[in-house]
Structures are given as C-alpha cells and as structure tokens.
Amino acid sequence: SLEKMHGFPTGNTGFLKGVSALYAGVIEGNLLIAGGCNFPDIPVADGGKKAYYRDIYIAPLSNDTAFEWKKIGQLPQAAAYGVTISTEKGLICVGGTTATHSLSDVFLLSLQKDTLKRETLPSLPVTMDNMAGALVGHSLYIVGGNVNGIPSSAMYMLDLSDLSGGWKRETDIPGEPRVQPVCVAQDGKLYVWGGFAPAVEGHQASLSVDGYMYSPETKEWSSVATPYDAEGNEISLGGGMGTSFGEGMILCAGGVDKDIFLKALQGIYAGKEYLSHPVEWYRFNRNLLLYHPQTDKWTTLGEYEQGARAGAVIVSQDGFHYIINGELKPGIRTNEINRIKEKRR
C-alpha cells in the first residue's frame, strides 16, 4: 500500500517548496534529510537560478503518517546530487555538487545523545556527483555520475573495515556513461540500471535502459533484464530510485521517459518551450517495479502518480519505503513524502 506522509520542515521557505537530490537515510530510528536543490523563486523555464541547501533535519520514524521535524545541524556546504549510505555507525555522505563545484568529500554523520557528529572519511580520488551507490558487506561502491565533471561509467570502492586503504577504482560498468543511474545491493551483489549522458566533446548524448549485476568476488559485470512495464515497454530508471525489498527483491520507481529525455539531451527539445509543458507530457515513470534476482524477471506493482519523480530519494526501514520529494517535471519540485508499505505475510 502507498500512503502520503504529513509534515515537512518549515524553517526555510525555499526548502519548504521541496527539493531534488537530497542526502537522506535512517539514523537511530530517525529519518534524516539534508541538502538538496530547487528553483524557489523564478521558475527554471523563466531563467530561474537553482538554490542549494545546507540544513540537516531529523524526524522520528513510526507507523504514524505524521513527521515532526527538527533542525539538528548543517552540511559542510550547501550541496545536492551526492550519495547517502546507511550503515550501523551512521550515514555516510559521498560527493555531490554545490552551486559552483563538484565534491570529493566523504563523511559519516552519527547521532550521539541527540547531538549530530560529523567524522571525515577518506575523500574520493576524483570529484563525483549525480552518481549512485550501495553497500555490499563492508564494501561501499559508488558508480557512474559525473567524474571530474565528465559523464562516466567508472566505479570506486571503499572498504569500511580498512579505511587506510582509501578508495580503489573497480571495473567500469559496461556501456555508455551513466549519470543518475539506480544502484541497489542485494544478496552480496550490486545491481545497476539506467542512466544518461549529455553530449560532451567527442561523445553524442546517450540514454541507457539496460542493467548489470556486479559480483565482488569475480570483479565482473553480467547483463540482467531491462525493466519494462505491464505492456512490455522498456523503462528508463535514469533519475529514478531503487531499494532492497521483501525477501531478496529490488523495488525501483521513478525515472525520466527514455524517448522524451533523450530528445532533450540531444537538444531536439530545448529551452522555454521544452520546460513549459504540463507535468503529464514528460511521462516520468509511474510504475512501481519489482525485480526478482533469482529469476531475472520484472513485475509491476501498479502505476502510481506518487512514484513518477526524477531526483527523488528512497529510504527504507523495517518494511517501509519513503519516497522523498523530487521533481514532477524539469525544474518543478514537490515537498511530498510518500510511504510504500510492504505486505507482511
């Protein structure tokens, strides 16, 4: 089932409008959100300037649908488009970008007696933003995104049990560069789908729908099934979200429409005209999708407007999956948080 949550931090009128690409996770039984970006004043279609946020908020998690938020600190700088990984010790925030530059910073946020602590971890050897990541055992993997400002298919790994070793470059994911892919760990393997890349010197724009599974033992990628809807149409999860679900499954939601967004990347759709259509025109993915690793098959849980987001973040805890903010169409955010509840056997 899917239910709307109530309550969003009100301390900053810009942030209150909802953001994309925030840092988020579960920390000591609380949902933590931080950073993110939006166009709070003038819409992007009218040349508005993107604002980035710095505040960190927490709200206790319960079965209740109401959040009570409190500000608990600030990020080192206003940022968005990084990766947040929940660990036993706290939340690890990796990379991202500010209004002016991409980041290589990595740090651990932890709660000690209601006080937020920040511990510096080894920095990435490159700057990374708009990437994805997941934890397999004590290996933290970060894949795709912009690496030193260029769309990439690179992957880096940090062994959390041996921080002195720093980040290591792992096997690139096959195919085109993948900005804003979806990455989920399940049963000791890493799964990645989707992603796109604007044109850069020597490379034309691309959009990927395919997926791969990475085995840490062999350090090799193998192809897995492309997501598709009930009619059999392939779905782009680029800009979407994914999380482990139920008994060994993976839940994916959101993402841009593969045909429309590729035309935007190619410049066929551009400027104010492209940005001024109604929400429905952009056809963000409405399907809640379940991937079954054992059979390499996809099923759909149905179509939900609440899942049709790009740049939303999904956070999971005890059979609840929170879809946080994101955009309804390019430049237009929502401050909604919706919760998917697993059916318990």
Task: Indicate residue ranges for each PLM-predicted region.
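Kelch-like beta-propeller repeat domains
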Residues: 1-345
